[in-house]
Swiss-Prot record:
It comes from Pseudomonas putida. Pathway: Amino-acid degradation; L-histidine degradation into L-glutamate [regulation]. Residues 18-86 form the HTH gntR-type domain. The keyword Ribonucleoprotein does not apply. GO terms for biological process: L-histidine catabolic process to glutamate and formamide; L-histidine catabolic process to glutamate and formate; negative regulation of DNA-templated transcription. The lineage of its organism: Bacteria, Pseudomonadati, Pseudomonadota, Gammaproteobacteria, Pseudomonadales. This is Histidine utilization repressor. SUPFAM superfamilies: Chorismate lyase-like, Winged helix' DNA-binding domain. Repressor which binds to the hutP region in the histidine utilization (hut) operon. It blocks the expression of all the hut genes in the absence of inducer.
Amino acid sequence: MPTPPVSALVAQMGEGPAPLYARVKQMIIQQIDNGSWPPHHRVPSESELVNELGFSRMTINRALRELTADGLLVRMQGVGTFVAEPKGRSALFEVNNIADEIAARGHQHSCQVITLTEEAAGSERALALDMREGQRVFHSLIVHFENGVPVQIEDRYVNAAIAPDYLKQDFTRQTPYAYLSQVAPLTEGEHVVEAILAEPEECRLLQIERGEPCLLIRRRTWSGRQPVTAARLIHPGSRHRLEGRFSK
Protein backbone atom coordinates (compact mmCIF):
# COMPACT_ATOMS: atom_id res chain seq x y z
CA MET A 1 0.00 0.00 0.00
CA PRO A 2 1.58 3.33 -1.02
CA THR A 3 1.99 5.85 1.78
CA PRO A 4 -0.14 8.96 1.23
CA PRO A 5 1.71 12.28 1.38
CA VAL A 6 1.19 14.39 4.49
CA SER A 7 -0.70 16.98 2.47
CA ALA A 8 -3.30 14.33 1.61
CA LEU A 9 -3.83 13.65 5.31
CA VAL A 10 -4.78 17.18 6.29
CA ALA A 11 -8.39 16.66 5.23
CA GLN A 12 -8.64 13.71 7.62
CA MET A 13 -7.89 15.91 10.63
CA GLY A 14 -11.19 17.79 10.52
CA GLU A 15 -11.87 21.00 12.37
CA GLY A 16 -13.47 20.12 15.69
CA PRO A 17 -12.84 21.63 19.14
CA ALA A 18 -9.77 19.53 19.97
CA PRO A 19 -6.44 21.34 20.50
CA LEU A 20 -4.22 21.42 17.42
CA TYR A 21 -1.58 19.10 18.91
CA ALA A 22 -4.31 16.55 19.71
CA ARG A 23 -5.53 16.67 16.11
CA VAL A 24 -1.98 16.05 14.87
CA LYS A 25 -1.69 13.10 17.27
CA GLN A 26 -4.97 11.65 16.05
CA MET A 27 -3.89 11.98 12.42
CA ILE A 28 -0.67 10.07 13.14
CA ILE A 29 -2.47 7.41 15.21
CA GLN A 30 -4.92 6.91 12.35
CA GLN A 31 -2.08 6.26 9.91
CA ILE A 32 -0.56 3.72 12.31
CA ASP A 33 -3.86 1.98 13.04
CA ASN A 34 -4.87 1.61 9.39
CA GLY A 35 -1.45 0.24 8.42
CA SER A 36 -0.41 3.16 6.21
CA TRP A 37 2.52 3.79 8.57
CA PRO A 38 3.79 0.33 9.64
CA PRO A 39 6.47 -0.32 12.30
CA HIS A 40 9.82 1.31 11.38
CA HIS A 41 8.11 3.74 8.97
CA ARG A 42 9.89 7.08 9.09
CA VAL A 43 7.52 9.82 10.26
CA PRO A 44 7.88 13.18 8.48
CA SER A 45 10.23 15.53 10.33
CA GLU A 46 9.00 18.41 12.48
CA SER A 47 9.92 20.84 9.70
CA GLU A 48 8.03 18.80 7.11
CA LEU A 49 4.94 18.61 9.31
CA VAL A 50 5.10 22.35 10.06
CA ASN A 51 5.26 23.13 6.34
CA GLU A 52 2.55 20.67 5.31
CA LEU A 53 0.08 21.23 8.15
CA GLY A 54 0.66 24.92 8.75
CA PHE A 55 0.89 24.48 12.53
CA SER A 56 3.61 25.84 14.80
CA ARG A 57 6.75 23.85 15.60
CA MET A 58 5.68 23.85 19.26
CA THR A 59 2.39 22.16 18.32
CA ILE A 60 4.10 19.52 16.19
CA ASN A 61 6.81 18.92 18.80
CA ARG A 62 4.24 18.36 21.55
CA ALA A 63 2.31 15.86 19.43
CA LEU A 64 5.47 13.88 18.61
CA ARG A 65 6.73 14.00 22.22
CA GLU A 66 3.44 12.70 23.60
CA LEU A 67 3.21 9.91 21.03
CA THR A 68 6.78 8.93 21.89
CA ALA A 69 5.93 8.89 25.61
CA ASP A 70 2.91 6.71 24.77
CA GLY A 71 5.21 4.22 23.03
CA LEU A 72 3.75 4.70 19.54
CA LEU A 73 6.80 6.47 18.10
CA VAL A 74 10.55 6.11 18.59
CA ARG A 75 12.75 9.20 18.25
CA MET A 76 16.35 8.29 17.36
CA GLN A 77 18.77 11.15 17.91
CA GLY A 78 20.28 12.39 14.68
CA VAL A 79 18.29 9.89 12.61
CA GLY A 80 14.60 10.76 12.85
CA THR A 81 11.27 9.61 14.25
CA PHE A 82 9.84 6.20 13.42
CA VAL A 83 6.72 4.17 14.12
CA ALA A 84 7.52 1.90 17.06
CA GLU A 85 7.31 -1.85 17.16
CA PRO A 86 4.96 -3.16 19.84
CA LYS A 87 7.00 -2.93 23.04
CA GLY A 88 9.38 -5.75 23.83
CA ARG A 89 8.48 -7.62 27.00
CA SER A 90 10.54 -9.21 29.75
CA ALA A 91 9.30 -11.36 32.59
CA LEU A 92 9.64 -9.52 35.89
CA PHE A 93 10.23 -12.62 38.01
CA GLU A 94 12.47 -14.53 35.60
CA VAL A 95 16.05 -14.27 34.33
CA ASN A 96 16.04 -14.83 30.58
CA ASN A 97 18.37 -14.54 27.61
CA ILE A 98 17.59 -11.32 25.73
CA ALA A 99 18.49 -13.01 22.43
CA ASP A 100 15.83 -15.66 23.10
CA GLU A 101 13.23 -13.04 24.04
CA ILE A 102 13.85 -11.17 20.79
CA ALA A 103 13.79 -14.37 18.71
CA ALA A 104 10.49 -15.37 20.34
CA ARG A 105 9.00 -12.17 18.93
CA GLY A 106 10.16 -13.21 15.46
CA HIS A 107 12.84 -10.52 15.37
CA GLN A 108 16.60 -10.44 14.81
CA HIS A 109 19.01 -9.98 17.71
CA SER A 110 22.44 -8.40 17.32
CA CYS A 111 24.81 -6.64 19.68
CA GLN A 112 27.81 -4.34 19.92
CA VAL A 113 30.52 -4.96 22.51
CA ILE A 114 31.66 -1.60 23.88
CA THR A 115 33.87 -2.76 26.77
CA LEU A 116 35.39 -6.11 27.76
CA THR A 117 38.07 -5.69 30.42
CA GLU A 118 39.53 -6.92 33.70
CA GLU A 119 39.35 -4.62 36.73
CA ALA A 120 40.04 -4.63 40.45
CA ALA A 121 36.82 -4.71 42.44
CA GLY A 122 36.00 -1.47 44.21
CA SER A 123 33.88 -1.37 47.33
CA GLU A 124 30.54 -1.37 45.47
CA ARG A 125 31.44 -4.32 43.22
CA ALA A 126 33.03 -6.24 46.09
CA LEU A 127 29.87 -5.88 48.17
CA ALA A 128 27.60 -6.91 45.28
CA LEU A 129 29.69 -9.99 44.47
CA ASP A 130 30.56 -10.93 48.08
CA MET A 131 34.32 -10.61 47.57
CA ARG A 132 37.22 -8.58 48.91
CA GLU A 133 38.13 -5.20 47.46
CA GLY A 134 40.90 -5.51 44.90
CA GLN A 135 39.95 -8.99 43.74
CA ARG A 136 39.64 -9.52 39.99
CA VAL A 137 36.34 -8.86 38.24
CA PHE A 138 35.51 -8.83 34.55
CA HIS A 139 33.52 -5.92 33.13
CA SER A 140 31.48 -6.06 29.93
CA LEU A 141 29.39 -3.27 28.41
CA ILE A 142 27.18 -4.43 25.54
CA VAL A 143 24.39 -2.80 23.54
CA HIS A 144 21.69 -5.20 22.36
CA PHE A 145 19.65 -4.49 19.22
CA GLU A 146 16.26 -5.74 18.04
CA ASN A 147 15.92 -5.51 14.26
CA GLY A 148 18.72 -2.94 14.29
CA VAL A 149 17.15 -0.75 17.00
CA PRO A 150 19.01 -0.51 20.36
CA VAL A 151 16.81 -1.90 23.14
CA GLN A 152 19.19 -2.60 26.04
CA ILE A 153 22.50 -1.57 27.55
CA GLU A 154 23.94 -4.49 29.51
CA ASP A 155 26.57 -3.26 32.00
CA ARG A 156 27.81 -6.42 33.72
CA TYR A 157 30.47 -7.32 36.32
CA VAL A 158 31.48 -10.96 36.68
CA ASN A 159 33.36 -12.81 39.42
CA ALA A 160 36.55 -13.74 37.56
CA ALA A 161 37.22 -16.76 39.78
CA ILE A 162 33.95 -18.38 38.69
CA ALA A 163 34.17 -17.60 34.96
CA PRO A 164 37.92 -17.32 34.26
CA ASP A 165 37.52 -17.50 30.46
CA TYR A 166 34.90 -14.74 30.27
CA LEU A 167 37.16 -12.29 28.42
CA LYS A 168 37.95 -14.89 25.73
CA GLN A 169 34.33 -15.15 24.57
CA ASP A 170 32.86 -13.64 21.40
CA PHE A 171 29.70 -12.05 22.74
CA THR A 172 28.52 -11.10 19.28
CA ARG A 173 27.91 -14.85 18.77
CA GLN A 174 26.51 -15.78 22.17
CA THR A 175 25.29 -13.53 24.96
CA PRO A 176 26.96 -13.35 28.38
CA TYR A 177 23.80 -14.95 29.79
CA ALA A 178 24.17 -17.97 27.48
CA TYR A 179 27.86 -18.41 28.31
CA LEU A 180 27.45 -17.99 32.06
CA SER A 181 24.53 -20.44 32.08
CA GLN A 182 27.00 -23.08 30.88
CA VAL A 183 29.88 -22.39 33.28
CA ALA A 184 27.90 -21.33 36.37
CA PRO A 185 24.26 -22.45 36.11
CA LEU A 186 21.84 -20.02 37.71
CA THR A 187 20.27 -21.08 41.01
CA GLU A 188 19.04 -17.72 42.32
CA GLY A 189 18.42 -14.22 40.99
CA GLU A 190 17.58 -10.79 42.32
CA HIS A 191 15.92 -7.90 40.45
CA VAL A 192 15.61 -4.28 41.56
CA VAL A 193 13.64 -2.12 39.10
CA GLU A 194 13.89 1.67 38.85
CA ALA A 195 12.70 4.42 36.52
CA ILE A 196 15.62 6.69 35.58
CA LEU A 197 16.61 9.47 33.22
CA ALA A 198 19.38 8.22 30.97
CA GLU A 199 22.84 9.76 31.17
CA PRO A 200 24.18 11.47 28.01
CA GLU A 201 26.42 8.52 27.05
CA GLU A 202 23.56 6.09 27.61
CA CYS A 203 21.34 8.24 25.38
CA ARG A 204 24.00 8.11 22.67
CA LEU A 205 24.28 4.32 22.85
CA LEU A 206 20.50 3.85 22.84
CA GLN A 207 19.98 6.52 20.15
CA ILE A 208 17.40 8.39 22.21
CA GLU A 209 16.88 12.03 23.12
CA ARG A 210 18.63 13.37 26.20
CA GLY A 211 16.53 13.00 29.32
CA GLU A 212 14.28 10.30 27.89
CA PRO A 213 12.91 8.05 30.67
CA CYS A 214 14.44 4.60 30.87
CA LEU A 215 13.82 1.41 32.80
CA LEU A 216 16.77 0.22 34.90
CA ILE A 217 16.95 -3.35 36.16
CA ARG A 218 19.69 -4.08 38.69
CA ARG A 219 20.26 -7.82 38.53
CA ARG A 220 22.39 -10.13 40.64
CA THR A 221 22.64 -13.87 40.01
CA TRP A 222 24.01 -16.75 42.07
CA SER A 223 25.27 -20.23 41.30
CA GLY A 224 24.97 -22.19 44.51
CA ARG A 225 25.94 -19.86 47.36
CA GLN A 226 28.29 -17.69 45.30
CA PRO A 227 27.24 -14.48 43.51
CA VAL A 228 28.33 -14.75 39.88
CA THR A 229 27.34 -11.44 38.31
CA ALA A 230 25.99 -7.99 39.10
CA ALA A 231 24.48 -6.17 36.13
CA ARG A 232 22.68 -2.97 35.21
CA LEU A 233 20.23 -3.42 32.32
CA ILE A 234 18.97 -0.15 30.84
CA HIS A 235 15.99 -0.10 28.46
CA PRO A 236 14.41 2.93 26.75
CA GLY A 237 11.01 3.33 28.39
CA SER A 238 9.36 3.74 25.00
CA ARG A 239 10.63 0.35 23.78
CA HIS A 240 10.22 -2.00 26.72
CA ARG A 241 7.87 -3.20 29.43
CA LEU A 242 8.04 -5.70 32.27
CA GLU A 243 5.38 -8.31 32.95
CA GLY A 244 4.82 -10.50 35.96
CA ARG A 245 2.20 -12.88 37.27
CA PHE A 246 1.96 -14.33 40.73
CA SER A 247 -0.49 -16.27 42.86
CA LYS A 248 -1.21 -15.95 46.55
